[in-house]
Amino acid sequence: MNKLDLPLCLSVIATIASAQSIDVPITQFKLDNGLNVILHEDHSLPTVSVNVWYHVGSGSEKPGRTGFAHLFEHILFEGSKHVPEGKFDRWLEEAGARNNGSTTEDRTNYFEDLPSNALELALFLESDRMGYLLDVVTPEHVDGQRDVVKNERRQRIENQPYARIRVALPGLLYPSDHPYSWSVIGSMEDLSAATDEDVKEFFREFYGPNNASLVVAGDIQTDEARKLIEHWFSDVPRGREPPKNTFPEVSLSKEKRVFFQDRVQLPMIHMAWLSPPIFADGDADLDMLASILSDGKNSRLYRRLIYEMEAAQTVVAYQ
C-alpha cells in the first residue's frame, strides 16, 4: 500500500479566541481616569495574578503601519520613569514572580503571577509603565526592540517549516485593507520604515488607562487591593479617546487555493473557514466540534487519518 506522510491542519478562524462563560464572583469598578478594574478573591493558594489588558492589537493598526502593537509588547519591558532599564524583570524575579506579555489582533496583555505579599510591587510596575513609559523611551530603545522583533519574525516565520502559511492565511480570508489581513508580528518593511515618533504616537493613542482593564485575582482582600490600586493608578493621566475599531462584515464568495513551495520533507494541507465572532451563535458549537475532531488519539480525525488511512502524521483542528 502506498503511504503518504501528510501533516494535516484544519482551522476555523474567529475574530478573537473563544472563551466560556463562568460564574466567578468579582468586584468591578472604574477609576476617574477611566481604568476598568476587576477583582476576584481566591484564598486557595498564597499567590495573586495581576493582568493588564490594553484594548489594542494588530486590529488597531493601519496598512503600512503594521507590527506596532507587538513592538510595544517588547518596549514596555525596557523600563519607565521610575523603573531603571533592566530592573522590571529583575525586581519581579527577586520577588519570586513569573511574568510575560502577549499580543493578538484585539488586545495586548501583560501579567505577573507572584506571592500575594508582593502584590504592591506588581501594581507599582504596571502603573509606572502605563503612565510614564515615554519619559524614557529613546530612538535607541525603539531600534533595539525593532531588531528583536525582526529576529523573532525570522525565527518564527522565515526560518520555520510551514510557517509561511500562517502569514498568508489571513490575507486569503480578509480583504487587503482589513486589519485582520496581516499578521500580528507585522511586516519587515513596516517595522523598518517606522520612525521613533510613529511608534510613540501609537502609544499615545492607545495605551492610556481609559483604554485598559486591570484584573487582580487570587489571595487578596478586596478592600486592601482596591486601596493599593487607587494609590498607584489614580494619578496616571487619562489618555486620548482611542478610535473604535469598526470592521465590515467579511464573507467568502468562492473557495481559494494557494500552493507554496518550501524546503520541507512532508507536505501540509491547511484548510480554514471564517467562523462567528466570540459569543455569537455557533461559536461554542465550533469549539466543541474542533475538540471532537482532533483532541487526543481517540478523536475522529486522528483515528481516521492516522490509524485507519495512514495518510497523515499529525492532525489538528482549532478555532
Predicted regions and their residues:
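Mature N-terminal segment immediately following signal peptide/propeptide cleavage
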Residues: S21-Y54
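His/Glu-based metal-binding/catalytic segments typifying zinc-dependent metallopeptidases
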Residues: R154, G171, E241-N298
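Short, solvent-exposed loop/turn elements at domain surfaces
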Residues: V37-H40, P46-S49, S58-K62, E120, ...
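M16/MPP (pitrilysin/insulinase) zinc-metallopeptidase core fold and M16-derived inactive scaffolds
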Residues: S49-D113, S181-I185, D295-A311
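N-terminal secretory signal peptides that target proteins for export/translocation
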Residues: M1-N2
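Solvent-exposed coil/turn segments that connect beta secondary-structure elements
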Residues: D42-S44, W53-G57, S80-K81, P115-N117, ...
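Bacterial N-terminal signal peptides
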Residues: D5-T15
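Charge-rich, well-structured scaffold segments of protease-associated domains
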Residues: K30, D89-E241, F259, I269, ...
